[in-house]
Amino acid sequence: MDLWQLLLTLAVAGSGSAFSGSEATPTILGSASQSLQRVNPGLGTNSSEKPKFTKCRSPELETFSCHWTDGVRHGLKNAGSVQLFYIRRSTQEWTQEWKECPDYVSAGENSCYFNSSYTSIWIPYCIKLTSNGGTVDQKCFSVEEIVQPDPPIGLNWTLLNISLTGIHADIQVRWEPPPNADVQKGWIVLKYELQYKEVNESQWKMMDPVSATSVPVYSLRLDKEYEVRVRSRQRNSEKYGEFSEALYVTLPQMSPFACEEDFQFPWFLIIIFGIFGLTMILFLFIFSKQQRIKMLILPPVPVPKIKGIDPDLLKEGKLEEVNTILAIHDNYKPEFYNDDSWVEFIELDIDDLDEKTEGSDTDRLLSNDHEKSLNILGAKDDDSGRTSCYEPDILETDFNASDVCDGTSEVAQPQRLKGEVDLLCLDQKNQNNSPSTDTTPTTQQPSIILAKENKPRPLLISGTESTQQAAHTQLSNPSSLANIDFYAQVSDITLAGSVVLSPGQKNKAGISPCDMPPEVASLCQANFIMDNAYFCEADAKKCITVAPHVEAESRVEPSFNQEDIYITTESLTTTAGQSGTTERAVSSEMPVPDYTSIHIIQSPRGLVLNATALPLPDKEFLSSCGYVSTDQLNKIMP
């Protein structure tokens, strides 16, 4: 309905203007405008259809003015339709009377101006707009809060300097404070902000606010034209006033060449060459440290290495130097068996633990299983002329110590042996109820091969097949047990490390140790004095066969050391005359040689024993002895 009414009104207005002229035009347009406002309220100047405050401003902190919109009746309202009333608080209370605006004209249309008579700082104000007796808008403030100074005036610039290249220049911009602001007396303190740009640009470059009325601008191009403007604000406020008029700065071109394009530093080339140089340095570093880098990336596998040994010694084959180095450590002992002679020893088979419970050591020694050991003892020594497996220095020390020990115990030795014989005799009486029968075995005399050197060595018994068979027959025959002594007790340990064993059964001649007098039992145990003359070991042990006949010939007592292999010439000549009668009595029977002391423990299965000498006839004496001097031979031979 309203739209049709509006269209009808326009049509009537058009027809009326054709007839009555322009007199009725304002009235018709006013009614049409009201109709349009009712149809579409957004077409009005104020969408709220009410007057409203836009701003209140004090340019110098002495006066202020407020502005508002006129609302719906813009340009058509009657005078006095919109009014402004204000009130201010004096002391601590608001005045109850609202006062109307003192000046609607000085500040412009739709504004109210308050001069210095109506302005008070640090006192709050409240203002309101009324239309047809009703309040449409209201606002409260203080004068110092609405200060917005006027723009500065009198802008100009001064050239400071020009660069050596003639491309850039520095200028100084100056201006004057706003004329209505009492800056000289300090009533108001202002801050200024300068902005500049090239004429063809749209973005302004702002400088920091300053309190002075001049500021330098640096690095302006000489061939460009710049636009400069300034605005101000109160020191304690953030609201800037209006900008001043723009100042155009045109700098003359002082350079002889055109500077449309500045000299560009070749950053691109520098970056390329820099990367290339760094790459070359990196490659050189890797090439020079490739071994170290390889060890860091791929560490070598550690190999066993003995500290203190030079690998070159192992490559060159100097094993003696290696053994010397290793001998420094306590847990290493050099092995000399590679370069030593064969060592003869009796092998004891103790692999099977069950065999230990089958019988005694004596039964196993006499059994057929021990034939292997006898064969070893009966093997011929082709290496008899070689030196012993033990170092001469070590053996020389051991035998010297043994000689000292034997010399000091010369008096106590017979007494100790006598006591041991008594103990063995007592054990034999307890074990044997009936005396054993003595039978004289017939054996061939085994040959004794001696060492070439003057140092003692373990004895090797070698002979023909008949000798081996005779020895086996004698050991296997029960009747020959009377001629064998088994040493089961340790009587003494010498300083050289040898163990002296004591017999536990009858002697080889069939006479029990308890039936023999103490002098006979200790006849061959006396110590002899070692001499430098060489002679066979077998002749030194003839006192063993003389022992049964000592009752008749006790006046002759040869003195030699049982553990020594070589005897002196004096002892040999003393016993040479008696050997004939003694050997005739015992030539018919020859006992198996007995091992009275342990020389060394070769292995967990083997023992190296020192063998007692066997009596030999006169004819065998020279054949078995290869180391007799001429003087000794002249004394022995008739």
UniProtKB/Swiss-Prot annotation:
The soluble form (GHBP) is produced by phorbol ester-promoted proteolytic cleavage at the cell surface (shedding) by ADAM17/TACE. Shedding is inhibited by growth hormone (GH) binding to the receptor probably due to a conformational change in GHR rendering the receptor inaccessible to ADAM17. On GH binding, phosphorylated on tyrosine residues in the cytoplasmic domain by JAK2. The modification Phosphotyrosine is found at Y487, Y595. Expressed in normal and tumorous mammary tissues, being localized in epithelial and myoepithelial/spindle cell components and in the activated fibroblasts of desmoplastic tumor stroma. Isoform 1, isoform 2 and isoform 3 are found in both normal and tumorous mammary tissues, isoform 1 being the predominant isoform. Isoform 1, isoform 3, isoform 4 and isoform 5 are expressed in the CMT-U335 cell line. SUPFAM superfamilies: Fibronectin type III. GO terms for biological process: cytokine-mediated signaling pathway; endocytosis; growth hormone receptor signaling pathway; positive regulation of cell population proliferation; positive regulation of receptor signaling pathway via JAK-STAT. The chain crosses the membrane at residues 265-288. A motif (UbE motif) lies at residues 340-349. A motif (WSXWS motif) lies at residues 240-244. Residues 19-264 are extracellular. Residues 151-254 form the Fibronectin type-III domain. Residues 428-448 are annotated as: Disordered. On growth hormone (GH) binding, forms homodimers and binds JAK2 via a box 1-containing domain. Belongs to the type I cytokine receptor family. Type 1 subfamily. The WSXWS motif appears to be necessary for proper protein folding and thereby efficient intracellular transport and cell-surface receptor binding. PANTHER family: CYTOKINE RECEPTOR (PTHR23037), INTERLEUKIN 5 RECEPTOR SUBUNIT ALPHA (PTHR23037:SF46). This is Growth hormone receptor. It comes from Canis lupus familiaris. The lineage of its organism: Eukaryota, Metazoa, Chordata, Craniata, Vertebrata.
